[in-house]
């Protein structure tokens, strides 16, 4: 069984909890300390300690931090374990209200922690709120629209050939995605491109890709054929049927659709099978979860650092000052913001590379990096990647 690493469970926590820019209205060190206590209590089956530590951790996260819904989910399940349906429903409702990634409540269907409250009126009322979910459609430029509210940022390229989607959101959001598209066009969906295998990006495949070609990296299809662990004890069954990609992309490819060239680049790092999509004529780039806009000053390069640098150099060379960059989560940014994050990442990579060349240990490199203001988890991760290449 393939398990999501801790970094994925916390929405790429390595990137989001590093650096001073994220802590302007919160204290992430305090958050980490209390959250680790909560996980230790959970492992010890101490429900009271689990709940208390989560309540202590939550206020230290900034208001729009991408990890807030993850902590809200844990708080809901902690109260559900004690049979407190009102408190569990309150935290699930807060997830939906915040609209960061409220549809993470999808996982409650597979989480036995919610069994004590599943039949309660308050829990059912929250789940019914999903039926009224709105996905908004905003025209970006050219043929491309941004669909928000489905669990991830979806790009929709629309024209006479039909609709091409980049990512599909959670399955719970698929009806709302179709309603949003219906306000733009009556054309059918012809392509769905999955940037990677995580449920918030592929859950809508079965509905949105029912009459379309679903494109993804072979590693994404491999992952979808296996059960996926969200958190300990919460396992999503394998995908089947229309949920599975049928067009597999292992090398850069281009397709002509709606009068423009659409380039698809493999860029592993967040997972083993990440894809990014460049709409040449519309001048839009969708980075999936390879870029968390404004959440971190860096971009995680992954284990294949040299391949990452080569691909990013080629990709950035195609961008213009007017390029709009869609991240898997967070705001649309100009190309300059993506480039700034990339240049900061190159500086970090070069620092670690020099330390490795000088035969420094990982502990020495972490200490040197800390003195330079580099986040220690990033230094250690890049050190490991470079020494394994």
Regions found by a protein language model. Give the residues of each.
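Metallo-beta-lactamase
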Residues: 162-163, 169-172, 254, 261-351
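Conserved beta-strand hairpin/beta-sheet module of binuclear metal-dependent hydrolase folds
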Residues: 138-180, 277-279, 283-289
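Accessory terminal helices/loops
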Residues: 81, 112, 116-131, 316-324, ...
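Active-site HxH/HxHxD metal-binding segment of metal-dependent hydrolases
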Residues: 179-254
């Amino acid at each position: 069984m393939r398990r999501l690493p801790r970094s994925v469970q916390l929405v790429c926590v390595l990137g989001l909890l590093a650096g001073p820019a994220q802590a302007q209205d919160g204290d992430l060190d305090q958050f980490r300390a209390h959250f680790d206590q909560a996980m230790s209590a959970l492992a010890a089956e101490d429900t009271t300690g689990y709940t208390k530590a989560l309540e202590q951790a939550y206020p230290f996260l900034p208001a729009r931090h991408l990890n807030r819904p993850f902590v809200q989910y844990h708080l809901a399940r902690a109260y559900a374990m004690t049979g407190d349906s009102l408190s569990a429903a309150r935290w699930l409702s807060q997830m939906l209200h915040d609209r960061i990634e409220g549809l993470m409540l999808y996982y409650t269907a597979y989480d036995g922690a919610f069994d004590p409250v599943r039949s309660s009126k308050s829990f059912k009322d929250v789940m019914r709120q999903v039926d009224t979910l709105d996905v908004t459609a905003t025209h970006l430029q050219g043929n491309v629209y941004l669909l928000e509210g489905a669990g991830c940022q979806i790009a929709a390229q629309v024209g006479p050939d039909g609709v091409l989607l980049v990512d599909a959101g959670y399955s719970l959001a698929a009806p709302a995605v179709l309603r949003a598209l219906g306000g733009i066009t009556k054309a059918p969906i012809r392509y769905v491109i999955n940037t990677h295998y995580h449920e918030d990006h592929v859950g809508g495949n079965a509905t949105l890709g029912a009459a379309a070609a679903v494109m993804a990296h072979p590693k994404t299809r491999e992952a979808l054929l296996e059960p996926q662990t969200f958190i300990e004890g919460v396992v999503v069954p394998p995908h089947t049927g229309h949920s599975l990609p049928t067009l597999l992309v292992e090398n850069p490819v281009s397709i002509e659709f709606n009068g423009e060239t659409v380039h698809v680049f493999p860029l592993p790092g967040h997972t083993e099978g990440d894809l990014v999509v460049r709409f040449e004529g519309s001048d839009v780039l969708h980075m999936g979860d390879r870029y968390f806009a404004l959440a971190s000053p860096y971009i995680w390069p992954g284990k294949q650092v040299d391949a990452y640098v080569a691909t990013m150099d080629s990709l950035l060379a195609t961008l213009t000052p007017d390029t709009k960059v869609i991240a898997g989560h967070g705001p649309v940014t100009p190309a300059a913001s993506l480039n700034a994050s990339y240049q900061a990442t190159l500086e970090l990579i070069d620092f670690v590379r020099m330390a490795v060349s000088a035969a420094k240990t990982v502990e020495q490199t972490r200490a040197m990096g800390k003195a330079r203001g580099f986040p220690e988890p990033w230094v250690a991760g890049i050190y490991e990647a470079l020494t394994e290449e």
